From Swiss-Prot:
Keywords: Aminoacyl-tRNA synthetase, ATP-binding, Cytoplasm, Ligase, Nucleotide-binding, Protein biosynthesis. Transmembrane segments: none annotated. A motif ('HIGH' region) lies at residues 51-61. This is Glutamine--tRNA ligase. The lineage of its organism: Bacteria, Pseudomonadati, Pseudomonadota, Betaproteobacteria, Burkholderiales. GO terms for cellular component: cytosol. Its main location: cytoplasm. Its EC number is 6.1.1.18.
Length: 580
């Protein structure tokens, strides 16, 4: 499938196709009047978010969460969180816990007036086994004793039909006996599988007698060693939906070819009287393809294992634990999802749309502060050594009710190294000998020169305060200047580690085609500096977010930031530095 670049506006233009489907079902009463097994009326729509607990959720999952929980809320329904935990080899409670935390962090709940709607496919193992026997008894499933390699080879391809298994015509009695012996643990892994009997010449290869159960002697994180056979996803998923009274099973496009199998399983069980109508229906929407990122679990695991990142929660990672640590807010992710909308066709969404959503959200909520990230000392020569002038600035320029923050102006300050030059280029309005600038929230100063070490490196800048020019006083505008620089008092500044994060890759599609995604790693995706911060930041708590004026938005690291030893991460810059 071709993937064209798309803006958020373009993607959002088709964002209502799922709503149209739901509206039609509501108008036609498709799921009206339903009750659960306890006789309680069921809501008009029920959706679900069904992750497999074999890894950490990423930004693509956030879109699925937003779609499923958001539509359920919009229509007065409910959304279930269900773990599709049918592969004991790859799944772990660590991932279960992280997924629960991530969904909660995004602001969603699977609880409502009828209780807790957190489910595990493994809780249905006994029922799933019973449904498999129903299919066997109907002649719709059989035990195949071919090896996995033989099954794959005999499935055919898009140009030739599959070859029926030599075991396809086993009797119902033999199939039942073998299946029960499989459950009893009489066979080794791979010795037998249960397959659906559909059509080995079907144009859709998924329908060529897919495997429904396999033998897997492995410890399960919930059921322990109670089972040695496990159902496949395609068999489990649709039945779990039906058991939970799901109405709209919303999946991403890679499951489109699996929809006929979804319907085949449910239709057979309905016709056998094992499941009541109306049955759930599957609908597909485009998954999120974000530029300058990868979401493949295998490739993300490679980054972690090769220590190219600092773990799954590295702020450069697209995992939800990573972007949370980066400082993204749940509201910004929801805003991003709203802007890109829901489409039927795959497309690439530019990272700048996500970053703009984060920027817009933090602009409205983040208190302002000052940080000097590449410091050089500025000495005000015409004031005494004990000079200490109180200055103030609004906590947020658009929210005066938040008050003002106080900080001192002293004789020695820290300023950004880039705010001084001896030989200014055209259009440079900051400090150079003879030039005047305003110290933000303070006085106008005139630069008089600088000090250098033996190697010619600038070690200090010198200037004089121009009296009666303090910001907010009657004489503030008596001296006109074009430059305005930020600063912190050298005596009062808070020293802190600041981690300057950027995009992990330099290529917008780092793993497309035959590219080696490792070749596109951005060497400047993380820089660590020792910075000097406004003293008001001493009280910052983990996950407190701020705008560092002139620099961007920053967050106190949720893991490493400690009282008296703060660590800040750059969330996003004030402007898009990657735009063409």
């Amino acid at each position: 499938m071709s993937q064209d670049n798309a803006t958020g506006a373009a993607a959002a233009s088709t964002s209502n196709f799922l709503r149209q489907i739901i509206d039609t079902d509501l108008e036609q009463g498709t799921y009206a009047g339903r009750q659960d097994t306890a006789g309680h009326a069921l809501p008009p729509i029920i959706t679900r978010f069904p992750p497999e607990p074999n890894g950490y959720l990423h930004i693509g999952h956030a879109k699925s969460i937003w779609v499923n929980f958001g539509l359920a809320k919009e229509y007065g329904g409910r959304c279930h969180l269900r773990f599709d935990d049918t592969n004991p080899v790859k799944e772990d409670t660590e991932y279960v816990d992280s997924i629960i935390d991530a969904v909660h962090w995004l602001g969603y709940s699977w609880q409502n007036g009828t209780g807790e709607h957190l489910y595990y496919a493994s809780d249905y193992f006994e029922q799933l086994y019973g449904f498999a026997e129903v299919l066997i008894q109907r002649g719709a499933a059989y035990i195949d004793s071919q090896s996995a390699e033989q099954i794959a080879a005999n499935r055919g391809d898009f140009t030739r039909p599959g070859t029926p298994s030599p075991f396809r015509d086993r009797s119902v009695e033999e199939n039942l006996a073998l299946f029960r012996d499989m459950r009893a643990g009489k066979y080794q892994d791979g010795q037998h599988v249960l397959r659906a009997r559909i059509d080995m010449a079907a144009p859709n290869i998924v329908m060529r007698d897919p495997v429904l159960y396999r033998i897997r002697h492995a410890h399960h994180h919930r059921t322990g060693d109670a089972w040695c056979i496990y159902p496949m996803y395609d068999f489990t998923h649709c039945i779990s939906d039906a058991l939970e009274n799901i109405t709209h099973s919303l999946c991403t496009l890679e499951f489109e070819n699996n929809r006929p199998l979804y319907d085949w399983v449910l239709d057979h069980l309905r016709d056998a009287g094992a499941l009541p109508a109306p049955l759930p229906h599957q609908y597909e929407f485009a998954r999120l393809h974000l530029t300058y990122a990868i979401t493949s679990k295998r490739k993300l695991l490679q980054l972690v294992n090769e220590k190219r990142v600092d773990g799954w929660d590295d702020p450069r990672m697209p995992t939800l634990v990573g972007i949370r640590r980066r400082g993204y807010t749940p509201e910004s992710i929801q805003l991003f999802c709203e802007r890109v909308g829901v489409s039927k066709a795959d497309s690439w969404i530019d990272m700048s749309i996500l970053e703009a959503a984060v920027r817009d959200d933090l602009d409205a909520r983040a208190p302002r502060s000052v940080a000097v990230l590449d410091p050089v000392k500025l000495i005000l020569d015409n004031v005494p050594a004990d000079f200490n002038e109180p200055c103030s600035a609004p906590v947020h320029p658009k929210q005066p009710e938040l008050g003002r923050r106080e900080f001192p102006l002293t004789r020695e300050l820290w300023i950004e190294r880039e705010d001084f030059t001896e030989t200014p280029p055209k259009g440079y309005f900051r400090l150079f000998p003879g030039n005047k600038v305003r110290l933000r929230y303070g006085y106008v100063i005139e630069c008089t020169g600088c000090d250098k070490d033996a190697d010619g490196n600038i070690t200090a800048v010198h200037a004089n305060i121009i009296p009666d020019t303090k910001s907010g006083t009657p004489g503030a505008d008596s001296v006109k200047v074009k430059g305005n620089i930020h600063w912190v008092s050298a005596a009062h500044a808070l020293e802190a580690e600041v981690r300057l994060y950027d995009r992990l890759f330099t290529d917008p599609q780092p793993d497309s085609g035959d590219k080696n995604f490792l070749d596109a790693l951005n060497p400047d995706a993380k820089r660590v500096v020792t910075a000097y911060l406004e003293p008001t930041l001493a009280t910052a708590k983990p996950e407190d977010r701020f705008q560092f004026e002139r620099h961007g938005y920053f967050v106190a690291d949720r893991i490493d930031s400690q009282p008296g030893k703060p660590v800040f991460n750059r969330v996003v810059g004030l402007k898009d530095s990657w735009g063409k």
